[in-house]
Amino acid sequence: MSQLITKAALRVLLVCGRGNCNMFVSSVSSTSVMKSPYEITAPMRIHDWCGGFGDFKIGSKHVQGNFNLRWMGMSSASAMEKKDENLTVKKGQNGGGSVAVPSYWGIETAKMKITRKDGSDWPWNCFMPWETYQANLSIDLKKHHVPKNIADKVAYRIVKLLRIPTDIFFQRRYGCRAMMLETVAAVPGMVGGMLLHLKSIRKFEHSGGWIKALLEEAENERMHLMTMMELVKPKWYERLLVMLVQGIFFNSFFVCYVISPRLAHRVVGYLEEEAIHSYTEFLKDIDNGKIENVAAPAIAIDYWRLPKDATLKDVVTVIRADEAHHRDVNHFASDIRNQGKELREAAAPIGYH
């Protein structure tokens, strides 16, 4: 009687191990092939649960397990891993560099072959040749907006007050002053562009190009800073000061723009006027020999399309022209709001950068 029970139990286990497990493993393994090689452990576990172990005993009987299913799962997993490795190596060879992850998303990590006009390789990832430009050196540097109303006077006084600690701290160290100035000047365009972007999608209306114009301004000011970082190496306490000033100015300007965009743009207009003055003094010290007229950084030569023999004086000159353009744009934006109109009602000055 006990032998009959043992034989019946063995038949049930063998049927499960050879029948059901084949079905489970084949279906799950085919699904895992489509998903990921790392999910291939699932069918092996199912095979184990269904009785496809190695050698095992039931009572006094010794049963030889079936390894065909396990081997099939393991071989398919190793084949898939090998296939992915080949794909990775092949992409690395074709792309000119090692690829850490197979490009499942269709994103090519290898850099395109971009060259300068002279045929040399383009070295920058932060901007491309079609994003470079020549600054408008004929722009009027002496323009000044005379404060007319309370908002204008408040903006003018704010900027004059901000200049006092800057003059005390940096004095005539115009390289460090320019570095600090650009960390502040890169904030308003980003804040204004961000708030206009949110307003545009909130009210389902176009911005008249002002989002693009302000974000271009922020990026341009950031490139000024990246250029200055090639010339000036700030000390640790100056870096700490930058973090402090940026945090305070960003939040203050954000609140100001939410409350009164007219005032915010006027403040930026006056800040740019101060920037023009600072860079003019910078140029005077270069002409007087107080600051060495060193060779221009490579990033500046490519970004502003300067001649290969350009110097620091050329770099400061084009940066000053950029600041004059930002001055005009922000005073223009404030004038639009001063007339009770939205910025989108007047076309934004796009295309300078």
UniProtKB/Swiss-Prot annotation:
InterPro entries referenced in this protein's UniProt entry, alphabetically: AOX, AOX_sf
CDD domains from the xrefs?
A: AOX (cd01053)
Q: What does this protein do?
A: Catalyzes the cyanide-resistant oxidation of ubiquinol and the reduction of molecular oxygen to water, but does not translocate protons and consequently is not linked to oxidative phosphorylation. May increase respiration when the cytochrome respiratory pathway is restricted, or in response to low temperatures.
> Which signals induce this protein?
No effect of antimycin A, ethylene or cold treatments. Up-regulated by paraquat and cysteine treatments, but down-regulated by erythromycin, citrate, glucose and H(2)O(2) treatments.
Catalytic activity, as annotated: 2 a ubiquinol + O2 = 2 a ubiquinone + 2 H2O
List where this protein forms a coiled coil.
none
Q: What does the record note about the cofactor?
A: Binds 2 iron ions per subunit.
Gene3D superfamilies, per this entry?
Alternative oxidase
Mark out the transit peptide: 1-21
Could you tell me the EC number(s) of this protein?
1.10.3.11
Q: What gene is behind this protein?
A: AOX2
Q: Please indicate which superkingdom the organism of origin belongs to.
A: Eukaryota
Q: How does it sit in the membrane?
A: Multi-pass membrane protein
Q: What is this protein called?
A: Ubiquinol oxidase 2, mitochondrial
Q: Which residues are recorded as binding Fe cation 1?
A: E182, E221, H224, E323
Q: Does the keyword Metal-binding apply?
A: yes
Any idea which positions bind Fe cation 2? Answer: E221, E272, E323, H326
Q: Where are the transmembrane segments?
A: 178-198, 240-260
Q: How does it assemble?
A: Homodimer; disulfide-linked.
Which coenzyme or cofactor does it need? Answer: Fe cation
Family, per the entry? Belongs to the alternative oxidase family.
Principal localization reads: mitochondrion
- Give the matching Pfam families: AOX
Q: Which GO terms describe its biological process?
A: alternative respiration
